Each structure stands twice: as C-alpha cells, then as structure tokens.
Amino acid sequence: MILSGKTISEKLTEKELEITPLTEEQIQPASVDLRLGPHFVTIDDSKEAVISFERPIRYREWTTSDETIVLPPHTFLLATTMETVKLPNHLTAFVEGRSSVGRLGLFIQNAGWVDPGFNGQITLELFNANRLPIELPIGRRICQLVFAEVTGEVAPYQGKYLFQKGATMSEIYKDAF
C-alpha cells in the first residue's frame, strides 16, 4: 500500500522514517519531494574507451558551490539529493521524477528502487534529452519518493550502496554472477 502524506508525516514525527534535512513543503499528498544536491559524477570519457561491467570505471566528480549546474544536451550525469533517507525494514520507496521536470526533457533515474533498511543519500541518474542545455538549480525540488509498506519479514538492505554520501559511482563490477 502506498503511504499518504499524512502517514508519512506521522512516521517522520515518530522517527520511524527519517529524511534530513526536510521542510513541510516537501511532503506531498502521497510522496516526499527531494532536492538536488551539489555533488556530481560523470564518466571520464577521456580515460575510458568502453564501459565494462567487469572493472571499475574512471569517473570525474565534483562538488559545486554555484547556485546552478548546466547539463549539456544528450548528456548523462549522476547527481545526489540534498536529503539523507533512512528507511525502516518494513518500508520501501520508489524514486520518481517530478512531472514538471520531466516536461522539460530531463529524465531522472532509471534505477528508482530504494530497498527496506536503506540509509544514505539517493543517487540520481540524470539525462538531458533535449538539443538545448538545461540549467539545474541546486536545492530545487527535482524528484519524489513514493513509500510503500512491505509485507512479511524482510532482511534490511546490506548492499554496496548502504550509507552512500553524494552521487555514487556504479559498483556493478562487484556483483557476483
């Protein structure tokens, strides 16, 4: 069952669910809006001839103190949320792009699942589908988390992205076959 904004607020008040920092305006009727953080990562294409699942990829990462970042046309970028999210073992969340943002041609995430027990910042996969650059304001609401109850017993998330801070690079090379 999808949680209502009222239920989300109650779980936040009871510290059953934690999202920090958070303002009341971010809580929506059935979701929580998350804001764009200042940390970014992109594949360093000057050092990579091909992207492989079998080895680490070299990335370029930076944190900006600017108020905006410009995403060039047809460009992929990893970003992070300002907020840190801590889910209990009985809740899961879906990361969804905000409709108003998507209508500008900015695609947000293609791996939008947050497992029960996750604790960390959310890495966002951003893609500018336009022929024009998009100026992204740091601190602007960019995506939303939709929460759902998980039935039955579940082991908390213990994966490689637990406690991630900032935009986090792919670690698919660590996966077992």
Swiss-Prot record:
Keywords: Hydrolase, Magnesium, Nucleotide metabolism, Nucleotide-binding. Its cofactor is Mg(2+). NCBIfam families: dCTP_deam. The active site is at 125 (proton donor/acceptor). InterPro entries: dCTP_deaminase, dUTPase-like_sf, dUTPase_trimeric. This is dCTP deaminase, dUMP-forming. It catalyses: dCTP + 2 H2O = dUMP + NH4(+) + diphosphate. Pfam families: DCD.
